[in-house]
Regions:
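Non-catalytic cap/lid and distal C-terminal segments of serine-dependent acyl enzymes
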Residues: 1-130
């Protein structure tokens, strides 16, 4: 859950981080309650919906304002996380928060990530040169 963790930390600590990026990240963990042993940390989803709601990136967006973070979201068109990334993109658009949203052919695998890293580096190179 690296992409979720990166965004989670950056949004919660925007006073420390100026930018955040995710490639194939699970931006909303709620559709996947039986995966990655998350219920060990958050409890059973059906019994702890509020806890899950409070621990998913897409709901942290409400605490962001445009300009708080430079954000890049990148996800393959065949990735099982595509829908939650698209949902995050739409939430950011609704809040008028500038961000880069990239989708290309590819899945949740090393081949996609090896290609994606070039876009992430370009994004952060530009960010750090400001």
């Amino acid at each position: 859950m690296g992409g979720h963790g990166a965004m989670w930390n950056a949004i919660r600590h925007k006073d420390i981080f100026g930018g955040a990026g995710t490639t194939s990240g699970g931006m909303d963990i709620r559709p996947f309650p039986k995966n990655w042993e998350m219920s060990k940390q958050l409890g059973d989803y059906d019994s702890n919906k509020e806890v899950w709601d409070n621990h998913t990136v897409i709901n942290l967006i409400d605490g962001l304002e445009n300009g708080d973070l430079a954000i890049i979201i990148d996800c393959g068109e065949s990735d099982f996380f595509l829908k939650v990334n698209q949902n995050l993109h739409h939430r950011l658009l609704e809040k008028k928060i500038d961000h880069d949203f990239v989708t290309r052919p590819g899945a949740h695998n090393g081949q996609y990530w090896n290609n994606s890293i070039d876009y992430q580096i370009l994004f952060f190179d530009k960010f750090f040169k400001k």
